[in-house]
């Protein structure tokens, strides 16, 4: 099943309850949508396992009502309580994936900034790294533009949440 929104496309995989959830946890998942009412396997255990084994995965918890035990306090990125529309679900998923993309872009931006600083130092000491330096500067510019583009799509609250997650790393 494909969800194709204006900016975000995602492939959806469903859990196979005939196998252990632990076997299905994959760090490559961008997003987990978790029904907080799930009893077998236990939703709380699934959330804990994903946080331990795939910490980069965004976790959206859905629940019929506000649960007494807050999934966000337990490590979920977002709680969506019912009843909610398809549009609310889609926009929440899109926002979480944009936040994840922003974090990835900023991680690469910071990595390239460090690399640029090292190459500048090597250039000043006479090493022939001009081509590498120009390549990194060009990539850095592209990532800065990409980050600005994503930032423009996030509300102030969404941007602050993405920034907090970056600083928590």
Question: Where are the language model's segments positioned?
Answer:
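Short hydrophobic/Thr-rich beta-strand motif most characteristic of the beta2 strand and flanking loop
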Residues: 6-17
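Conserved phosphotransfer microenvironments
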Residues: 18, 23, 27-52
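A short, hydrophobic beta-strand element within the central beta-sheet of small alpha/beta folds
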Residues: 50, 55-67
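Alpha4 helix (beta4-alpha4-beta5 surface) of REC/receiver domains from two-component response regulators
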Residues: 64-78
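A Lys-centered signature of the CheY-like receiver
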Residues: 82
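Receiver (REC) domain switch/active-site region of two-component response regulators
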Residues: 85
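Receiver (REC) domain switch/output surface
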Residues: 88-101
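C-terminal output/effector regions of signal-responsive regulators
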Residues: 105-169
């Amino acid at each position: 099943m494909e969800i194709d929104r204006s900016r975000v496309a995602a492939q959806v995989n469903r859990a196979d309850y005939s196998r252990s959830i632990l076997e299905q946890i994959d760090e490559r998942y961008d997003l987990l949508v978790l029904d907080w009412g799930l009893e077998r396997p236990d939703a709380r255990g699934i959330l804990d396992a994903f946080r331990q084994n795939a910490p980069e995965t965004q976790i959206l918890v859905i629940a019929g009502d506000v649960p007494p035990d807050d999934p966000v306090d337990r490590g979920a990125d977002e709680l969506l309580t019912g009843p909610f529309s398809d549009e609310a679900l889609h926009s929440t998923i899109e926002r979480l994936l944009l936040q994840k993309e922003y974090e990835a872009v900023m991680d690469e931006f910071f990595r390239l900034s460090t690399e640029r600083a090292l190459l500048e130092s090597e250039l000043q000491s006479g090493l022939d790294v001009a081509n590498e330096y120009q390549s990194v500067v060009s990539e850095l510019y592209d990532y800065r533009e990409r980050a600005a583009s994503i930032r423009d799509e996030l509300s102030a609250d969404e941007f602050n949440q993405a920034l907090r997650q970056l600083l928590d790393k």
